[in-house]
């Protein structure tokens, strides 16, 4: 029997239009980011061409925000396919510059000499392994201006919030209906597997930063 192996990236981009919060940026998330971008525009005395904005991935909400504000959007993604496919979700299309590569490897030559005011990464901490955090932050540090912002939106566990995997699956059966489990109840599954007081990530600061 031939094994059919899918690409998890395809699942995300193909179902993006069906996601809801927390799986995609909410209006309040975007309002917060917009405020930070406007601060940078003010810093440059209204010259939007000086604002450098990088998305790790191809998140359409962030690209749309750039179009709304009239600034160039750099996207750095594993696959050009993701960038092209999600372009259909971008209503206010900005000027875009795409670079293909891996955030956890050496920074591609196209970006090596760039410095950004704002770097966004939608749920990046949820899709990389704990041992890769150090490399991610090192690369982000190299790409950020000294007063730049890195905002990796992620799932948050509320204080004292508890869920079981059974509750997560029940929610999926009641609401998900044939949608991929992870894309529908991913956050709930993360919370259900969290070990109170044990699961945490510590990233060492080093001279390399």
Where are these regions (language model features)?
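A short acidic, Gly/Pro-enriched loop at the edge of an enzyme's catalytic core
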Residues: 104-119
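Active-site micro-motifs of SAM-dependent methyltransferase domains
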Residues: 105, 125-126, 157
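Conserved class I S-adenosyl-L-methionine
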Residues: 149-190
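Rossmann-like AdoMet/SAM-dependent catalytic core
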Residues: 61, 204-209
């Amino acid at each position: 029997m031939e094994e059919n192996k899918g690409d998890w990236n395809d699942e995300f981009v193909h179902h993006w239009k069906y996601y809801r919060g927390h799986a995609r940026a909410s209006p309040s998330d975007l309002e917060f980011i917009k405020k930070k971008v406007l601060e940078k525009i003010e810093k440059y005395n209204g010259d939007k061409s000086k604002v450098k904005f990088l998305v790790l991935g191809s998140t359409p909400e962030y690209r749309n925000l750039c179009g709304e504000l009239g600034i160039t959007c750099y996207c750095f993604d594993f696959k050009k396919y993701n960038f092209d496919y999600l372009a259909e979700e971008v209503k206010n299309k900005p000027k875009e510059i795409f670079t293909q590569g891996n955030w956890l490897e050496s920074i591609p030559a196209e970006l090596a000499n760039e410095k950004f005011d704002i770097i966004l990464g939608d749920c990046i901490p949820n899709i990389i392994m704990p041992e890769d955090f150090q490399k991610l932050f090192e690369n982000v540090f190299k790409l950020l201006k000294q007063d730049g912002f890195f905002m990796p939106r992620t799932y948050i566990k509320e204080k004292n919030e508890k869920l079981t995997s059974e509750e997560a699956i029940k929610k999926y059966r009641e609401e998900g209906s044939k949608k991929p489990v992870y894309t529908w109840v991913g956050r709930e599954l993360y919370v259900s597997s969290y070990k109170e007081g044990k699961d945490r990530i510590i990233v060492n600061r080093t001279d390399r930063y």
